[in-house]
């Protein structure tokens, strides 16, 4: 099989921009994203026309990651890394980083670094990344923000001479390419005007000086041989008892501009469990479609607070379904929708569903005290899920003893994280079902 990972020496180095261009350059690409991010996969899908899947060692486990990677392979798999190559949950080398994942899957790494303010010393940088964990196959480098072809030739000679790593090309310094990273930080793919035109400009600029033939050769020859046929790949055995367990049942999934953060593997796993899926819009629809359960994913409800609050018939329908004992799973933005209300940064409150007894207060900065990977434990201290928190809001006026589950960090820090009433699980954590099947069994 053909595959490679594009990883950077740090965040903001240009790997997303270059990943997008490379995904547009090959045919029938299987796009993947390391970690829990929702935004980048949306751009992957827009570019390739194929679903993009997250590969997260913490939330999915080794078996889950392996399944997803093999099952969804098409002509060539391109994995976009996260943060710096070796950055993970701690400073070990088995830390769920991009390097850890590449090593586990046996795929070559193409390292992205920038050429600003460097000369021969750029080789030392590459050598350091190569030698930190020799088990990681750094098979090539692409240099971003290069001032000229002559400068690149200096970089190339030094890197190949002192490290043995092949230089695959460079991206010229071009401030106009920054538009993509700016959009990626704020908007989803469907919200960017003239995205096709912008991507074509990006593709032309980035691929002008990259050796695609050599890159494809590396992807073909240096990916560890996989014996299994993709069609034979099955879900991990520990998930097999859930196959068709809910046949005949329907789950209604919120999907619109306010709620769009879903892992493709999660949706497919609901179908594997037997659920029929019906989508609805809490912004535009009058009621929840006929169903046995409701799934409210993450997104940006704060940006549509007026519309959501004003759609009182939908709010009443959500409440009615809850009172009827329907199961409700609500993650982050979906949880905010179930709260008593969302208070914006100016102090204005928009009333929501009033099922989770708290008020959500928007802020202008990431809540770093409630950020990152967590294990979710029940009242007996048993882990029922693995998740990730990332939010710019905090809770106010929380009624005590209404949250029955704790978020536990690797360093021992913990906090109450999920509101639980009747058949409702609502909280900030985003979960991947491969590592959270116990929660699903309790809920459904």
Identify the residue ranges that each predicted region occupies:
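ATP-dependent carboxylate-amine ligase catalytic core
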Residues: 2-13, 24-105, 113-140, 149-153, ...
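Residues that mark the start of a beta-strand
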Residues: 3, 28, 248-250, 276, ...
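Structural motif
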Residues: 5, 78-80, 110-112, 142, ...
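Hydrophobic positions on the alpha1 helix immediately C-terminal to the Walker A/P-loop
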Residues: 18
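C-terminal and late-domain segments of enzyme folds
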Residues: 102, 206-209, 244-247, 259-269, ...
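Internal gly/pro-rich beta-alpha loop/helix module
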Residues: 120-239
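Phosphate-binding active sites in nucleotide-utilizing proteins
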Residues: 239-243, 247-312, 316-323
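Cysteine-nucleophile active-site neighborhood
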Residues: 277, 301-378
């Amino acid at each position: 099989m053909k595959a490679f990972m594009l990883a950077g020496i740090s965040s903001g180095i240009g790997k997303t921009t270059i990943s997008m261009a490379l995904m547009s350059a090959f045919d029938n690409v299987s796009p993947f994203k390391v970690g829990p991010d929702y935004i980048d996969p949306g751009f992957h899908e827009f570019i390739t026309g194929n679903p993009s899947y997250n590969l997260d060692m913490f939330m999915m486990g080794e078996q889950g990651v392996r399944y997803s990677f093999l099952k969804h392979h098409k002509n060539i798999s391109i994995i976009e890394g996260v943060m710096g190559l070796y950055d993970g949950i701690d400073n070990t080398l088995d830390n769920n980083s991009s390097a850890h994942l590449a090593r586990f899957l046996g795929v070559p790494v193409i390292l992205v670094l920038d050429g600003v303010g460097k000369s021969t010393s750029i080789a030392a940088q590459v050598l350091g990344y190569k030698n930190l964990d020799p088990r990681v196959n750094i098979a090539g480098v692409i240099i971003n923000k290069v001032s000229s072809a002559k400068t690149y030739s200096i970089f190339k000679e030094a890197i190949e001479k002192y490290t043995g790593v092949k230089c695959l090309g460079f991206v010229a310094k071009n401030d106009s390419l920054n538009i993509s990273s700016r959009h990626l930080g704020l908007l989803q793919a469907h919200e960017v005007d003239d995205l096709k035109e912008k991507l074509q400009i990006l593709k032309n600029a980035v691929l002008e000086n990259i050796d695609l033939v050599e890159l494809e050769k590396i992807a073909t020859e240096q990916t560890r041989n996989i014996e299994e046929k993709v069609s034979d790949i099955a879900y991990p055995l520990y998930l097999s008892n859930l196959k068709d367990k809910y046949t005949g049942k329907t789950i209604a999934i919120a999907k619109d501009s306010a709620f769009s953060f879903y892992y493709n593997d999660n949706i497919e796993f609901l179908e594997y469990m037997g659920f029929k899926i019906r989508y609805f819009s809490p912004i535009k629809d009058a009621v929840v479609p006929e169903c046995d359960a409701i799934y409210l994913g993450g997104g940006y409800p704060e940006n549509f607070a007026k519309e959501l609050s004003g759609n009182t018939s939908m709010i009443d329908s959500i409440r009615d379904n809850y009172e009827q004992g329907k199961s409700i799973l609500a993650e982050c933005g979906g949880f905010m929708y179930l709260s008593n209300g969302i208070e914006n940064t100016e102090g204005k409150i928009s009333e929501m569903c009033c099922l989770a007894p708290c008020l959500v207060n928007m802020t202008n900065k990431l809540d770093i005290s409630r950020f990152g990977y967590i294990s979710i434990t029940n009242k007996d201290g048993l882990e029922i899920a693995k998740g990730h928190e990332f939010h710019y809001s905090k809770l106010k006026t929380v009624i005590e003893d209404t949250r029955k589950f704790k978020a536990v960090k690797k360093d021992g820090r913990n906090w109450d994280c999920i509101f639980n009433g009747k058949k409702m699980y609502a909280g900030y954590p985003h979960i991947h079902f491969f590592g959270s099947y116990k929660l699903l069994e309790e809920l459904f």
